[in-house]
């Protein structure tokens, strides 16, 4: 299991995957907007998206678990 963590505080701008999607390592999973920048969060491993724990518009903190990918 690989958790995708927020890198900095911000607002979820978009989610580009759904639970059950197959993803490759390095694939964009979601984008967080912080200080007028968009920060893409990428899959750390290839596998299946098991959880997406946030919704568009949600405020997140650095270190929050935003998604989970299983190999």
PLM features: residue spans?
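Generic recognition of well-ordered secondary-structure surfaces with a strong bias
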Residues: 6, 41, 54, 59-60
């Amino acid at each position: 299991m690989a958790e995708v963590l927020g890198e900095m505080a911000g607002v979820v701008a978009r989610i580009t995957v759904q639970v059950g999607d197959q993803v490759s390592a390095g694939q964009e999973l979601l984008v967080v907007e912080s200080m007028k920048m968009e920060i893409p969060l990428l899959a750390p491993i290839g596998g299946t998206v098991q959880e997406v724990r946030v919704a568009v518009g949600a405020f997140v903190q650095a270190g929050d678990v935003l998604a989970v990918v299983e190999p």
